[in-house]
């Protein structure tokens, strides 16, 4: 029974979700934060300071030493800059751990290294990260230790979107506004918000480790077969076939890591193509689903590294 996983116990254990906020935040602060999340009302700095303090204390209990504004630039993967919670040493040589509401809400990273920055100098390509409070923060554990990841949007000084998240949030707001108008037209006067949902499944090619030595095959960017695959049911690796043990062990590790970070990994099966498999989560609000997609991609890449399963990192 050493491999037993209590899903109810571990699910969302590394996420600063609504349950954690109810337990840790004062009732007034919790109510104000929920209004911001659900109605888009502005969050005062006084409330933000309390939220930041409790988020920091919770993250430290989870083993975090740093925090980062976690955003999705136009590179197709996430970006982040780690800052430790430590402050300047006091006169006695000891340090305090601090995390303010200002640090939670807004950051100012360099945008010159991203596709939107081009060849401009650093001071001319400023980018601002802004906390997306509708997507919960989480603690990620890796070789760097524990990192408090705060989902954010990434914009220019003049408000142009520099990431994938900002247009998504704006489109969600546009859909909400127009959908509510339509509902009112049909006589619905009680609905307060319309939220689009999304499910992003991931396909996993299961190549053998020794094949990774063939860089020429990897650089083609496509699946190669030396002979035509069987057309009928001659083999047992079809869509509903039993998943191979090596892939099952890999998916077990991926599922556990996903559940800890609140990703509802639900379905796993073989794909139609030989040596390909799929892992799919449950539908979630669009912006959260987009974040979960990036979390899943990182977990898939991290877990497939040799010598454990020798699966491709792409």
Per-region residue spans from a language model:
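Histidine/acidic residue-rich metal-binding segments in metalloenzymes
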Residues: 2-15, 19-101, 105-123
């Amino acid at each position: 029974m050493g491999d037993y996983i209590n899903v109810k116990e571990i699910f969302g254990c590394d996420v600063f979700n609504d349950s954690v906020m109810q337990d840790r935040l004062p009732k007034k602060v919790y109510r104000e934060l929920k209004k911001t999340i659900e109605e888009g009302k502005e969050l005062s700095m006084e409330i933000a300071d309390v939220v930041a303090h409790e988020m920091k204390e919770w993250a430290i209990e989870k083993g975090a030493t740093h925090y980062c504004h976690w955003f999705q630039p136009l590179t197709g993967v996430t970006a982040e800059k780690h800052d430790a919670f430590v402050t300047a040493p006091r006169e006695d040589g000891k340090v305090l751990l601090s995390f303010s509401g200002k640090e939670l809400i807004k950051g100012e990273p360099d945008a010159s290294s991203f596709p939107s920055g081009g060849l401009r100098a650093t001071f001319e390509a400023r980018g601002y990260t802004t906390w997306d409070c509708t997507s919960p923060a989480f603690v990620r554990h890796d070789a760097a230790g524990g990192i408090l990841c705060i989902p954010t949007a990434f914009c220019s000084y003049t408000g142009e979107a520099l990431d994938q998240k900002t247009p998504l949030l704006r489109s969600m707001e546009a859909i909400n506004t127009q959908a509510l108008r339509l509902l009112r037209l049909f006589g619905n006067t009680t609905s307060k918000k319309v939220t689009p949902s999304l499910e992003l499944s991931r396909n996993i090619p299961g190549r053998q480790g020794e094949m990774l030595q063939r860089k020429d095959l990897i650089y083609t960017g496509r699946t190669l077969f030396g002979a035509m695959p069987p057309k009928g049911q001659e083999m047992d690796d079809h869509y509903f076939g039993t998943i191979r043990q090596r892939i099952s062990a890999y998916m077990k590790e991926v599922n556990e890591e996903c559940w800890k970070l609140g990703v509802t990994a639900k379905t796993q099966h073989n794909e139609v193509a030989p040596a390909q498999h799929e892992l799919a989560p449950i539908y979630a609000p669009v912006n959260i689903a987009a974040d979960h997609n990036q979390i899943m991609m990182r977990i898939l890449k991290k877990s497939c590294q040799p010598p454990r399963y020798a699966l491709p990192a792409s």
